[in-house]
Amino acid sequence: VADNDAVMYNLAAGLFAQGLWETAYMVDLMGGQRRSVFTLPGAGDLYVTSMGGRNQRMGRYLGLGVPFSRAKAEYMADVTVEGAQLAQAIGPTVEQMVAEGKIDAASVPLMLTMIDIVCHDAPVEFPWDAFFAGNVA
């Protein structure tokens, strides 16, 4: 919120755009159709997921500085948080693929940050300077 009480969405917009950027990278890497990134399967789903529901609720706790494991245990113990489950499911594989050079870390800083937050209880600190710098043509 700005000094004049206006709600500011610049950070959310940056995260949303970076999410699409990284999705395009991963779709290209896996031989998918980039069109899906910018239509309902990509942008549409990301918008709905990020603007409400359980993922958004977890994001609020994380944004308040509550570590993922504590937020899950204390506030959402019996709730399925799909984004977190996905990060836990793919996190180790993504980290291994980055270590093996199969995924370019510079192209997915947001994904790696989210994996770190969910899988390793890292604090929420986004690498803003690394955004929009990866290999997306």
Set out the residue ranges of the language-model regions.
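NAD(P)-dependent Rossmann-like dehydrogenase/reductase catalytic/cofactor-binding core
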Residues: 3-7, 17-24, 28-137
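Short, contiguous, pocket-lining structural segments
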Residues: 11-15
